[in-house]
Amino acid sequence: MASIRELHQQLINKERSAVEITTEALERIAAIEPQVKSFLCITADRALETAKAVDQKIAAKEEIGLLAGIPIGIKDNMSTKGIPTTCGSRILENFIPPYESTVTQKLQEIGAVMVGKTNLDEFAMGSSTENSGYQVTANPWDLERVPGGSSGGSAAAVAAEECVVALGSDTGGSIRQPASLCGVVGLKPTYGLVSRFGLVAYGSSLDQIGPFGRTVEDVAIVLGAIAGYDAKDSTSLKLPIPDYTTFLNPSLKGVKIGIIEETFGEGLDSIVAETVNKAIEQLQALGATIERISCPRFRYGLPAYYIIAPSEASANLARYDAVKYGIREEAATLLEMYNKTRAKGFGSEVKRRIMIGTYTLSAGYYDAYYLKAQKVRTLIKQDFDKAFESVDVLVCPTSPTTAFKAGEKTDDPLSMYLSDLMTIPVNLAGLPGMSIPCGFDQQGLPIGLQLVSNVLEEGKLFNVGYAYEQSTEWHKQKPPLK
């Protein structure tokens, strides 16, 4: 499937119609879905309706934006009016939202074609998409392996060319880690840059919506479309949004890059370390100056996150009581109905995180756990602040390993949590981070390089990511799907 700019050119030159592009995407989904299972819901009627409207605009010689007529997948934790939004949970099995999320509304208004809602770990809690209450998504590079998570459906859909781009959400690495495992580009923007209105909350101080694409330019285009102030989101930043494509510079002359020392230690696969080091050498060859940077509190990100995120989740998920929507288990009393509904509706990982969160917020433990974790969070942010005094962009592996086999870590939550070791501190500090493909292991599984910049400096990520991408061929590789 071509890039956004290539498809846009074909549309305005009338070489292809939006309906033809959409039909091709829907046919690809029909052919690939039995193997990959990226989507929970295919929105063919709405997609073709949007595509027809784009074709009518072109016929009337009206100007269209870059995303008009472009097939896009939406993670199924973003509210879509009249279309099921399950969050990958049985508790929301029959839920059809009465309102549209800000990001999907923005995309709808510019004519982007939503082809479906993608699979995810239940309520975005997980790193493999195995926690979905409906199906397990496969990694397009090896169908026996996981695509990462929690936005595994979106990453797999883009890698398998079922859509051109997709939206995911990232609370502790849920865009960047699956992007790494599926060999695509994934961006977590600065906290507050993209509206969270209509995103079903997991960890409200950490969640952020961002794009997946096969190229850095595609991701930059989508970010430009979804970013911006929204009065419906109190954490939304009131700032002008630049044209992110202006940062796509193939030269890195004058760019200072820091290698986060703490990420090259225990638990990192040797092939991942070797591949990432080669990528760093390439950045140097493109003109960047490289130095080693210490972020001493980086390693405490994981334990701090697994106190803060479950604490916020336990409060956010208290609203699922079956009174007004979702599945309901009948019972003699209201309390019994709550208990039976939540016991049946939530999966084991969600229950685990609710329990952890309830415990850490309870009297007698709040100061010892939650408050201490928030203090650690502040120290991690201070480490990043100090690092950005001397460098423009920080680099490290996105994930300590390549994709693991489905079922391999389901009985070992701690091992699963370690998948987000490199990505979590970026969320805790509210910074933008992007994963770009930088090679493959001996089994042909993708490896990602994580780029991190200071608050609201996504442009620097696009500069470094684009320069690296244009000087390599990794983004052109395609999974061996039949």
Curated annotation (Swiss-Prot):
Its EC number is 6.3.5.7. It catalyses: L-glutamyl-tRNA(Gln) + L-glutamine + ATP + H2O = L-glutaminyl-tRNA(Gln) + L-glutamate + ADP + phosphate + H(+). It is an enzyme of class 6 (ligase). Keywords: ATP-binding, Ligase, Nucleotide-binding, Protein biosynthesis. The keyword Protein biosynthesis applies. InterPro entries: Amidase, Amidase_CS, Amidase_dom, AS_sf, GatA. It comes from the Bacteria. GO terms for biological process: translation. The active site is at 75 (charge relay system), 150 (charge relay system), 174 (acyl-ester intermediate). Pfam families: Amidase (PF01425). GO terms for molecular function: ATP binding; glutaminyl-tRNA synthase (glutamine-hydrolyzing) activity. Transmembrane segments: none annotated. One of its GO terms (cellular component) is glutamyl-tRNA(Gln) amidotransferase complex. Heterotrimer of A, B and C subunits. Belongs to the amidase family. GatA subfamily. Allows the formation of correctly charged Gln-tRNA(Gln) through the transamidation of misacylated Glu-tRNA(Gln) in organisms which lack glutaminyl-tRNA synthetase. The reaction takes place in the presence of glutamine and ATP through an activated gamma-phospho-Glu-tRNA(Gln). This is Glutamyl-tRNA(Gln) amidotransferase subunit A. It comes from Rippkaea orientalis (strain PCC 8801 / RF-1).
